[in-house]
Swiss-Prot record:
Subcellular location: Cytoplasm
Species, as recorded: Manihot esculenta (Cassava)
Task of the protein: This protein promotes the GTP-dependent binding of aminoacyl-tRNA to the A-site of ribosomes during protein biosynthesis.
PANTHER family membership: TRANSLATION FACTOR
NCBIfam families: EF-1_alpha, PRK12317.1
Modified residue annotations for N6,N6,N6-trimethyllysine: K79, K187, K306, K396
Protein name per Swiss-Prot or TrEMBL: Elongation factor 1-alpha
Region (G1): 14-21
Region (G5): 194-196
Residue positions where 5-glutamyl glycerylphosphorylethanolamine is found in the record: E289, E362
Modified residues (N6,N6-dimethyllysine): K55
Record Pfam families: GTP-eEF1A_C (PF22594), GTP_EFTU (PF00009), GTP_EFTU_D2 (PF03144)
Gene: EF1
Similarity comment: Belongs to the TRAFAC class translation factor GTPase superfamily. Classic translation factor GTPase family. EF-Tu/EF-1A subfamily.
Length: 449
């Protein structure tokens, strides 16, 4: 057995008709763990419905439909393998909740694959003011997705077909936009592909022999290996809490940073409740240590289920334990709010697993969202497209961290009127010291608080 491949998460972004589903479907289809029988079934159904052209996207549509109906889809279907990596595709963003998911992040993407429609009119629609190409790229950068691959898709449908001139034009325009967002376009491969015909997806295409760079598969292999934050202090936001007969209270969540081990004394923020971890399990197997990215359940001593809930964060009591945030200052980008946002605005913040109303106590500055330069001190309001620094006060106890120290706990979506109105990253946090929090006997014995 060779060394196991590294897992990476990829988010596929781009305008609605750019061919995201077809391209992703193609990769999963050719490189993924989809059972041949399943594919044959899909193909047969697609043929019966005269959807031949939709073959790859159809695979993805079927998966999405099954997932949305709550059929537990074998998540291997959203995975594919390159020579170097196991890749998982994070929610493809046709989804209304995509932005929220990308931020509250069931997983942080290591690389964004930006799909561009190269056809006449298609490219212009995607990159226009209202197109999603810009918004997705800006979001990816703001949320810390540092690496990007650009695919100039539908090269089989340019005029003339496989046009180098069209490719050059797109590379030039997209590069200048990505540079404004904050990416370095010299570090981004621009791969001309056809997600439908398969040109340059996996093998080199003779139709594009003027192009000398990597295929999409090779570009994915050139992604820099992500550093997992296991050396940081523990942060594990709870997703759920169960009471299991004969075992007791079992909180469940994903280790975002640090390491969780049996015998560790953990402090839950914002309450300050401190106790010992008896055991840690993943997929019904006992673990000696859980690392970032692991979804685990862990059993805690002498803690009632009612004392824990979703949004609470487990941390190591001896290593920068999680505390309640009295207030925090964030850099916010207003994305889709119909009016003006002024001091006193109180929407809901989705940050890690918590979902709490927060007051915009004070808009400190308005800034240029690309350069970060200050445009105005203490503006009266922010509106669509504006960015600014805002001091926020939670309406209930909550744990947040700075984006620089603990990225998954330092980015958030602002929700109002059933949509994401803004996104942000946290720059500084003023924390409260817990007073009178319960410390269980076993924790006290171990020299906890």
């Amino acid at each position: 057995m060779g060394k196991e491949k590294v897992h990476i998460n990829i988010v596929v972004i781009g305008h609605v008709d750019s061919g995201k589903s077809t391209t992703t479907g193609h990769l999963i289809y050719k490189l993924g763990g989809i059972d041949k029988r399943v594919i044959e079934r899909f193909e047969k159904e697609a043929a019966e419905m005269n959807k031949r052209s939709f073959k790859y996207a159809w695979v993805l549509d079927k998966l999405k439909a099954e997932r949305e109906r709550g059929i537990t889809i074998d998540i291997a279907l959203w995975k594919f393998e390159t020579t170097k990596y196991y890749c998982t595709v994070i929610d493809a963003p046709g989804h209304r909740d995509f932005i929220k998911n990308m931020i509250t992040g069931t997983s942080q993407a290591d690389c964004a694959v930006l799909i561009i429609d190269s056809t006449t009119g298609g490219f212009e629609a995607g990159i226009s003011k209202d197109g999603q190409t810009r918004e997705h790229a800006l979001l990816a950068f703001t949320l810390g997705v540092k690496q990007m691959i650009c695919c100039c898709n539908k090269m089989d449908a340019t005029t003339p077909k496989y046009s180098k001139a069209r490719y050059d034009e797109i590379v030039k325009e997209v590069s200048s936009y990505l540079k404004k967002v904050g990416y370095n376009p010299d570090k981004i491969p621009f791969v001309p592909i056809s997600g439908f015909e398969g040109d340059n997806m996996i093998e080199r295409s003779t139709n594009l022999d003027w192009y000398k760079g990597p295929t999409l598969l090779e570009a994915l292999d050139q992604i820099q290996e992500p550093k997992r934050p296991s050396d940081k202090p523990l942060r594990l936001p709870l997703q759920d809490v169960y009471k299991i007969g004969g075992i007791g209270t079992v909180p469940v969540g994903r280790v975002e940073t640090g390491i969780l081990k049996p015998g560790m004394v953990v402090t839950f923020g914002p309450t300050g409740l401190t106790t010992e971890v008896k055991s840690v399990e993943m997929h019904h197997e006992a673990l000696q240590e859980a690392l970032p990215g692991d979804n685990v359940g862990f059993n805690v001593k002498n803690v009632a289920v009612k004392d824990l809930k979703r949004g609470i964060v487990a941390s190591n009591s001896k290593d920068d334990p999680a505390k309640e945030a009295a207030n925090f200052t964030s850099q916010v980008i207003i994305m889709n709010h119909p009016g003006q946002i002024g001091n006193g605005y109180a929407p809901v913040l989705d940050c890690h697993t918590s979902h709490i109303a927060v007051k915009f106590a004070e808009i400190l500055t308005k800034i240029d969202r690309r350069s970060g330069k200050e445009l105005e001190k203490e503006p009266k309001f922010l509106k669509n497209g504006d960015a600014g620094f805002v001091k926020m006060i939670p309406t209930k106890p909550m744990v947040v961290e700075t984006f620089s120290a603990y990225p998954p706990l330092g980015r958030f979506a602002v929700r109002d009127m059933r949509q994401t109105v803004a996104v942000g990253v946290i720059k500084s946090v003023e924390k409260k010291d817990p007073s009178g929090a319960k410390v269980t006997k076993s924790a006290a014995k171990k020299g906890g608080k």
